[in-house]
Amino acid sequence: MKFIVKLFPEIMMKSKPVRMRFTKMLETNIRNVLKKVDESAKVQRQWDKIMVMVPDDRPDLIEAFGERLACIPGIAHVLQVNVSTFESVDDIYQQTLAVYKDQLAGKTFCVRVKRAGKHDFNSIEVERYVGGGLNQFTEAAGVRLKNPDMTVNLEIDNEQLYLVDKRIQGLGGFPMATQEDVLSLISGGFDSGVSSYQFIKRGSRTHYCFFNLGGDQHEIGVKQVAYHLWQKYGESHKVKFISVPFDPVVQEILERVDNGQMGVVLKRMMMRAAARVADKMGIQALVTGEAMGQVSSQTLTNLNVIDRCTEQLILRPLIAMDKQDIINISREIGTEDFAKSIPEYCGVISQKPTVKAVLSKVEAEEAKFSDDLIDRVIQDAVIIDIKEIATQMDTKITEAETVAAISADEVIIDVRAPEEEEKDPLEIEGIETKTIPFYKLATQFADLDKDKTYLLYCDRGVMSKLQALYLQEQGYSNVKVYRP
């Protein structure tokens, strides 16, 4: 049994030197991936295809090899074939009949032949001869050249006959590492997972930069998304996962920045930090999952203001995509379930975000920050080889307990920002309520009565859940989320 790996058409269109370089890289990538399945994998490069040989005594490898080949960038499709030699056109027919006789019963069919080498016949003659024989000596429902129930695919390569047993759709794109590296800003949601996948598929080693706003549980979830993408689509090359503790930045934004500017300022601070990380790694481009108009910070005006904070190239592969299309891709690539369980925190810090930020106003707000703020969070960043995440894959993302009813001995903590709380104060008769903004809760919770149970409240339930998880990570078990 062999697999014939067909190159993505854009590779075939390259100049001879570039095509050879891409093909060599694809051969290496295939070998690197399949060797992890079994050391017996043999890969052989030819001018227009790559052959993968499966040992005759290891039929158990066929399915595993096929699944891996389907996810390697640079492959148009893969043919799973039985290999033999032939002496004549009739011999080709006899071998085809032996394989397809039972499969054709009651079905319309056509025969398609691809041929390479010198022969005293052409492809059309083989199609007619084999098709006529199969039509006459099987119980097929007849020949149908357009939209048949079954297509009998044959490939003739000099003296070898390839009877195609299965056609596997490839990923397309370019072989990994034929394009330059990128740094993807990943949050674990639908958008950042799909945008990362798009650049893996296009041939870039995609490293991951995560801005941690939600404690260990949030980080574990995002790491699982990144590891899944790497293991399934980019395993042929090493990449890095960088975690940047960004809660000090968020706290300064909430305490010092005008509410309407918070979203744009946060994104600019993230871009600055990511650009610093990219510079250290020798990477020239950042990748984000932003789509035009999807949220307030992603208007063209705001994206323009965000881009002004760095000289790094910022790539947005999803910029004109609809949300449902993004979700559909996430389902296809296996990140949908991860994304459903990971909340997006960036959108909860501003209640009246501007959709037309003015650069001078944003820069004036940013002047309120500590000069060394970005330097400090970058210094505390943790960089790991993505393979190390495998040791954390069994860690489950825990959920903070959520309640709708309150007992008299429980205390509600309103964690909303002061202006939100003042606009719509939470008052429940007979229940003690405290007001502690979420960005101060971590430092003030230790001063509270440890014998009481505290229910955290915010309008959307996102920030309250985030803070409950963080407090639980610090060892506090007397905290829940209140969702009336």
UniProtKB/Swiss-Prot annotation:
Pathway(s) the chain acts in: Cofactor biosynthesis; thiamine diphosphate biosynthesis
Domain spans labelled Rhodanese: 406-484
Domain THUMP: 63-167
Active site: 458
CDD domains hit by this protein: PPase_ThiI, RHOD, THUMP_ThiI
Keyword presence, ATP-binding: yes
Disulfide bonds: 346-458
Catalytic activity: [ThiI sulfur-carrier protein]-S-sulfanyl-L-cysteine + a uridine in tRNA + 2 reduced [2Fe-2S]-[ferredoxin] + ATP + H(+) = [ThiI sulfur-carrier protein]-L-cysteine + a 4-thiouridine in tRNA + 2 oxidized [2Fe-2S]-[ferredoxin] + AMP + diphosphate; [ThiS sulfur-carrier protein]-C-terminal Gly-Gly-AMP + S-sulfanyl-L-cysteinyl-[cysteine desulfurase] + AH2 = [ThiS sulfur-carrier protein]-C-terminal-Gly-aminoethanethioate + L-cysteinyl-[cysteine desulfurase] + A + AMP + 2 H(+)
Keywords: ATP-binding, Cytoplasm, Disulfide bond, Nucleotide-binding, Redox-active center, RNA-binding, Thiamine biosynthesis, Transferase, tRNA-binding
InterPro entries attached to this UniProt entry: Rhodanese-like_dom (IPR001763), Rhodanese-like_dom_sf (IPR036873), Rossmann-like_a/b/a_fold (IPR014729), ThiI_AANH (IPR020536), ThiI_fer (IPR054173), ThiI_N (IPR049961), THII_Thiazole_biosynth_dom (IPR026340), THUMP_dom (IPR004114)
Entry's Gene Ontology BP terms: thiamine biosynthetic process; thiamine diphosphate biosynthetic process; thiazole biosynthetic process; tRNA 4-thiouridine biosynthesis
The enzyme's E.C. designation: 2.8.1.4
Location in or out of the cell: Cytoplasm
Main localization, broad class: cytoplasm
GO molecular function ontology, one term from the record: CCA tRNA nucleotidyltransferase activity
EC main group: transferase
PANTHER family registered for this protein in UniProt: TRNA SULFURTRANSFERASE
Protein family membership: Belongs to the ThiI family.
Function: Catalyzes the ATP-dependent transfer of a sulfur to tRNA to produce 4-thiouridine in position 8 of tRNAs, which functions as a near-UV photosensor. Also catalyzes the transfer of sulfur to the sulfur carrier protein ThiS, forming ThiS-thiocarboxylate. This is a step in the synthesis of thiazole, in the thiamine biosynthesis pathway. The sulfur is donated as persulfide by IscS.
Database matches in NCBIfam families: ThiI_C_thiazole, tRNA uracil 4-sulfurtransferase ThiI
Protein name, per record: tRNA sulfurtransferase
Record organism: Shewanella piezotolerans (strain WP3 / JCM 13877)
